[in-house]
């Protein structure tokens, strides 16, 4: 029994050894994978390494796909991020352009609406009554003719109205400011722009005024004055051409020329400034009171000082006008076309304390 059992055991071992020898040997274990060397990314214009498709895919050749180099993967990721950033920038630029176009469209709409509003305002009719206070003369209560403005207060009147007013007063008819102590006509100027506005606002006003002026001169047998035309500028080469008259012309209202001669002062008058210019041109409607005020202001006289003005042998009163004095005294008061007035300074006995 023991021998039979040992034979069976040996036979079994022999059959197992045959089976084992008939089976193919197991494949060797794969070698350990070492980290690949860092390969720099290809420069622009150079050909890079073969792609995965060229080396063979794992599904067709059972070969293990090569590991991706870190540098190449980083370069591709950077390229992808750069492309994505460029796309984002392009999208942002497109959005900004669209927003600008929308703003410009809104702005153009506002401009068009503003233009429409301005055109409506320009076409809006204004009642002439609203502008009447600005184009009327406060003296004659009519429309301004030959609009003349006072330079001290900028109030405007008809030329004839304000000149006639200054015959009796040296103050503005509106604000009562002193225009000039002795010669208010020096501080008025023609306002041609305002006169043009008046003529454009009031229909046929200019034509009616010209017709009335023409009829006025024609009824009295006088020559109708022609409008002033600009004179040609003389050539510097032509010696035979006449020299044009001076641009400065004395207003016809200032028709009286004075010669103021100082005859002396008593000892109690104190200090005073001498009169620098003794030749004065004024209106014939100016009074001796105006001349006295002129002398006081120019010479800086004390209020206690009295000014006596004499023409010939006559002591003149403050209310007398220069035209009346010339008419009353005659040519004896004249010297080379000048009205000679002598003045002296004394201290008033009523003001001595």
From Swiss-Prot:
Residues 71-112 form a coiled coil. PROSITE patterns: ZF_RING_1, ZF_RING_2. A zinc finger (RING-type) spans 137-176. It is found in: Nucleus. GO terms for cellular component: nucleus; PcG protein complex; PRC1 complex. SUPFAM superfamilies: RING/U-box (SSF57850), Ubiquitin-like (SSF54236). It comes from the Eukaryota. The keyword Ubl conjugation applies. Residues 83-103 have a biased composition (Acidic residues). Residues 23-39 have a biased composition (Pro residues). One of its GO terms (biological process) is negative regulation of transcription by RNA polymerase II. Signal peptide: none annotated. GO terms for molecular function: protein domain specific binding; zinc ion binding. Residues 40-52 have a biased composition (Low complexity). Expressed in ovary, testis, stomach, liver, thymus and kidney (at protein level). CDD domains: RAWUL_PCGF6, RING-HC_PCGF5. Disulfide bonds: none annotated. The keyword Glycoprotein does not apply. Residues 1-116 are annotated as: Disordered. Transcriptional repressor. May modulate the levels of histone H3K4Me3 by activating KDM5D histone demethylase. Component of a Polycomb group (PcG) multiprotein PRC1-like complex, a complex class required to maintain the transcriptionally repressive state of many genes, including Hox genes, throughout development. PcG PRC1 complex acts via chromatin remodeling and modification of histones; it mediates monoubiquitination of histone H2A 'Lys-119', rendering chromatin heritably changed in its expressibility. Within the PRC1-like complex, regulates RNF2 ubiquitin ligase activity. This is Polycomb group RING finger protein 6. It comes from Mus musculus.
């Amino acid at each position: 029994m023991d021998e039979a059992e040992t034979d069976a055991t040996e036979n079994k071992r022999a059959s197992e050894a045959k089976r084992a020898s008939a089976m193919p040997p197991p494949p060797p274990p794969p070698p350990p994978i070492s980290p690949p060397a860092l390969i720099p990314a290809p420069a622009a214009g150079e050909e890079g390494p073969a792609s995965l498709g060229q080396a063979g895919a794992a599904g067709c050749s059972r070969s293990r796909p090569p590991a991706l180099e870190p540098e190449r993967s980083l370069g591709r990721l950077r390229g992808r991020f750069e492309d994505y950033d460029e796309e984002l920038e392009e999208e942002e630029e497109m959005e900004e352009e669209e927003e600008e176009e929308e703003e410009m469209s809104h702005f153009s709409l506002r401009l068009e609406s503003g233009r429409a509003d301005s055109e409506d305002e320009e076409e809006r009719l204004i009642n002439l009554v609203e502008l009447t206070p600005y184009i009327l003369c406060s003296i004659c209560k009519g429309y301004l003719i030959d609009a003349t403005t006072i330079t001290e207060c900028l109030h405007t009147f008809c030329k004839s109205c304000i000149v006639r007013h200054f015959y009796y007063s040296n103050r503005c008819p509106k604000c009562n400011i002193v225009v000039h102590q002795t010669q208010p006509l020096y501080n008025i100027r023609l306002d041609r722009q305002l006169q043009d506005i008046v003529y454009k606002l009031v229909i046929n006003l200019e034509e009616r005024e010209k017709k009335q002026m023409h009829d006025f001169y024609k009824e009295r047998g006088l020559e109708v004055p022609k409008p002033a035309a600009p004179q040609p500028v003389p050539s510097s080469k032509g010696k035979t051409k006449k020299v044009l008259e001076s641009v400065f012309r004395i207003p016809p209202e200032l028709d009286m020329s004075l010669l103021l001669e100082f005859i002396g002062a008593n000892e109690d008058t104190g200090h005073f400034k001498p009169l620098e210019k003794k030749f004065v041109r004024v209106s014939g409607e100016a009074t001796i009171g105006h001349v006295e005020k002129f002398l006081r202001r120019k010479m800086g006289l004390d209020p206690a000082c009295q000014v006596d003005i004499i023409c010939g042998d006559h002591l003149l009163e403050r209310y007398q006008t220069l035209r009346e004095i010339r008419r009353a005294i005659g040519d004896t008061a004249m010297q080379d076309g000048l009205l000679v007035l002598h003045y002296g300074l004394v201290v008033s006995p009523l003001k001595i304390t």
